[in-house]
Amino acid sequence: MADIKAIAEQLVNLTVKEVSELATILKEEYGIEPAAAAVAVAAAPGAAGAAAEEEKTSFDVVLKSAGAAKLQVVKAVKEQCGLGLKEAKDLVDAAPSTVKEGVDKATAEALKKALEEAGAEVELK
């Protein structure tokens, strides 16, 4: 049980880049689709007999505003989305704008957290 808690602690502390690498490893080496794993985990509580609403599995990350630290937000968008500097700046300047579309919940929340830490106002749709 202690091992499982240690693994959970490590997962919670992963950076966005590490989460992306983990998803790639799970997919390429073990054939596990990250979205499929999330669905399997989400389905388990419903199996206990509780009437659960269907959870949304695909999210759009929307940058509502860059806030006061626009440069930091541009850097964060550039790093997180793999864009060039000009593309990242244009995306931030066009706020409100969609940063990423159709991503799983974990990726969306990690991206939202990274952008908010840079000073942006972000929402998930």
Swiss-Prot record:
Biological-process GO terms, alphabetical: translation
Top-level taxon of origin: Bacteria
GO cellular component terms given for this protein: cytosolic large ribosomal subunit
InterPro entries named in the record: Ribosomal_bL12 (IPR000206), Ribosomal_bL12_C (IPR013823), Ribosomal_bL12_C/ClpS-like (IPR014719), Ribosomal_bL12_oligo (IPR008932), Ribosomal_bL12_oligo_N_sf (IPR036235)
Record key words, sorted: Ribonucleoprotein, Ribosomal protein
GO MF annotations, alphabetized: mRNA binding; structural constituent of ribosome
One Pfam family, short name: Ribosomal_L12
Alphabetical list of SUPFAM superfamilies matching this protein: ClpS-like, Ribosomal protein L7/12, oligomerisation (N-terminal) domain
Protein task: Forms part of the ribosomal stalk which helps the ribosome interact with GTP-bound translation factors. Is thus essential for accurate translation.
Subunit annotation: Homodimer. Part of the ribosomal stalk of the 50S ribosomal subunit. Forms a multimeric L10(L12)X complex, where L10 forms an elongated spine to which 2 to 4 L12 dimers bind in a sequential fashion. Binds GTP-bound translation factors.
Family stated for the protein in its record: Belongs to the bacterial ribosomal protein bL12 family.
HAMAP family given in the database record: Ribosomal_bL12 (MF_00368)
Family annotation (PANTHER family): 39S RIBOSOMAL PROTEIN L12, LARGE RIBOSOMAL SUBUNIT PROTEIN BL12M
Protein name as annotated: Large ribosomal subunit protein bL12
Gene source species: Porphyromonas gingivalis (strain ATCC BAA-308 / W83)
Gene that specifies this protein: rplL
